[in-house]
Amino acid sequence: MNIRFFCLIKEDIRYWSYLYHIDKCKFFHLFIRFPEFRCLLKMRLKCGEQANSSFFLKILRILVAISCRYHNCFIYTEPNVIGKGLLLHHAFATMISAAKIGDFCHIYQQVTIGNGGGGIPIIGNNVTIYAGAKVFGNITIGDDVVIGANAVVTKDIPSHSMVAGVPAKIIKKRFCFKEAWKKYEDNI
């Protein structure tokens, strides 16, 4: 049995429940109310296929497959390289093919992440990609990055940046408390 598979689903449920203020019957509430959660669950279940063939997981796979049929959210990334707490907002007409997606990322509708000139992107932790953005190629998006709506990203983006435009340019560096504290400690 793949423990990581269950830990990731548990963390997804915890994070989604926190964001949407769900206190009771968390899994069932998320499963019924959010088609985006079902798409994420479908992707996570791919990872669990090799790990467990229990009756419950077989039934869950069938329910998820039926419910995700009409939502047009395609995740081609291997399930084991997507971090915990991935949040898909209105994830319709969304295509995701990344080498890695970090923890607690937010991806909005009509986002395309994929191949462009010989490689696929690596997405860091706490990245937010707004509606209609495109992220292409063998690039790295650092931690705590915000990609604006309809931006086209084809080059590496350093951590703690906010980018927008076609092609995407850094419009603001975001404050990082951890880095500031580390610099402070180094100077003492």
Mark where each language-model region is:
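Terminal amphipathic alpha-helical/low-complexity segments used for targeting or macromolecular assembly
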Residues: 1-71, 180-188
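Structural signal for interior beta-strand "rungs" in well-ordered beta-sheet cores
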Residues: 69-164, 168-171
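Eukaryotic, compositionally biased intrinsically disordered regions
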Residues: 165, 169, 176-181
